[in-house]
Amino acid sequence: MSKIYDWFEERLEIQAIADDISSKYVPPHVNIFYCLGGITFTLFLVQVATGFAMTFYYRPTVAEAFASVNYLMTDVNFGWLIRSIHRWSASMMVLSMILHVCRVYLTGGFKRPRELTWITGVIMAVCTVSFGVTGYSLPWDQVGYWAVKIVTGVPDAIPVVGPAIVELLRGGVGVGQSTLTRFYSLHTFVLPLLTVVFMLAHFLMIRKQGISGPL
C-alpha cells in the first residue's frame, strides 16, 4: 500500500493538500451558528441524491406526472422514504439557508473584503427558493397546478414586459405541458448547475479570505 501511496504522492502531492485543508486557521469566536452554511450544503447533497433517485421513476408530462409520483410512493421499494426525505430536507435547507444569511448579516460577514462572497451567497439563496417553486409543481396535482398558475401570473402586473415574461415562464399563454417541461428543466438541470458554479466560487473565496472576525 505504501508504494501505491508514494506513487500518487509523487504526482499529486496529496500530503500537501491534506495539510492545507487540515491546518486552516479557525478564529476563536466561531460558534455553532457558523455551521449553518455547512448544514445547508449537506442538505443540498441530500437533495441531489434523492432527486436523482426520483428521476428514474418520474415522468414530466401532464398526463403521467401525478401517476408516476403515486407509483413512486406506493409501489417502489422505499420510494415513499426517498420522496419524504427529499421533501423534508428541502424545507430544512430553506430554513438553514435563511438562518445562515441572518448570521452572516448580523455578524457583518458581508463587509469588505467579502462583498463577492456575500453576492454569490445571495444568488444561491435565490436559487434555493427557486428550487422550491419549481419542485412544488412537479407532481402536477391540484396544489402544484394552481401554485404554478399563480406564481407565473405574478409578472403580468409589470407594465409593458409583464405579459411577455408570463408567456416565457409558461411556454405559452396558458399553463400546460410546456410549463411543466420548463419547470422540470429548471429544477433538475439549470438551477443545480447554477448552484454548483456559485457554490464553488463561494467556497473558494471563503478559503482565500477566511472566516470574518468578530464585531
From Swiss-Prot:
Organism ancestry: Eukaryota, Viridiplantae, Chlorophyta, Ulvophyceae, OUU clade
Protein name: Cytochrome b6
Organism the protein comes from: Tupiella akineta (Green alga)
Gene that this polypeptide is encoded by: petB
Note: Heme 1 (or BH or b566) is high-potential and absorbs at about 566 nm, and heme 2 (or BL or b562) is low-potential and absorbs at about 562 nm.
Pfam families the UniProt entry points to: Cytochrome_B
Subcellular location: Plastid, Chloroplast thylakoid membrane
Its membrane topology: Multi-pass membrane protein
Binding annotation for heme b 2: H86, H187
Record key words, sorted: Chloroplast, Electron transport, Heme, Iron, Membrane, Metal-binding, Photosynthesis, Plastid, Thylakoid, Transmembrane, Transmembrane helix, Transport
